[in-house]
């Protein structure tokens, strides 16, 4: 412990573990510690079920009907992976995929007028969908063809639109798309949480819809993947990568002090010993005075004994409730997985509802989502602060991750990873940097 490291990492959330893995692959000497006895920090998967009851202070132990406690791995933060998104690229480049097994989520649904509809995933489904009328479908198809052909490097594909200037609102107008289709496109395909994007230049939205379509094209049912045994497997996979490259891991380590001299971090004190470092990466819980609150997220974990109604008995799905449908500013999300993913006892389903808090009564805000899930066997409610670093960390060399937001995918988390990487190294993040070195000696289990 009394050694000199290039980088010390505190907390084993996904952001911290990926950065720890990248730094180790890049030849840095890394020490990675966590005050908890388990991996994952805020983004852990909790097992056995008894631990979840304790964590949420629910009296008594789980009823017999819940099956064996150790058959459960319950994510605290609900997210899926976009099949063609940045996190999957990170997993492929680092070959962390060989520690994990994924399943494709069975469907994505959108809420309209109190009912849920499948987000069409093929042209045939789009034509048969009751989400929009026939003429609307033709216009929508034209729009999707435009998006598919759009290439930032080839102005011939712009068709009179200036991607850096034309707003998305104007693009929708150009294709004569109605309000329902706009809601569905912005929230179920581009995955925006609010409508602020409408008045921004359109290129980002077009790229988001492209990401959705390309992710969908990979596996066909939906654009989302989910790891067997829960999301807690992801940080552990990257932690193994870091360890293979010489990273040192210590769980259950109380952190007594982050030592700063002349405004710059020089080490971390734990159990009376000091480990020195040049740079520090940590989650907000280790540096409460260096972060600020920018909002809150409510998450409700619901245990069900049945699939969600009107989802074709899917054993996994996502439901998006666009804000317009329920008079809100931000969307409500439902992520559902089940025993099919080795995260619940046989015949059980876990549905997690999440959204950005907008009022003094957050539980009331998510009622439309809970109504879709009835009857609910057990609920676990959490309200978490959204925390962001007060500064970039370039002076102190303390680089702090953001807490996980209400989105149901990891794209914003990956943006944060790339951002921290740039602040730490001064260079743009490049996926090639993550390639394992050819002389890698694999820890064969």
Swiss-Prot record:
Tissue: Ubiquitous.
Residue numbers carrying N-acetylmethionine: 1
Keyword Iron recorded: no
Keyword Phosphoprotein belongs to the record: yes
GO MF annotation, one: GTPase activator activity
Stored SUPFAM superfamilies: FAD/NAD(P)-binding domain
Protein name: Rab GDP dissociation inhibitor beta
Organism, as annotated: Homo sapiens
Gene name of the encoded protein: GDI2
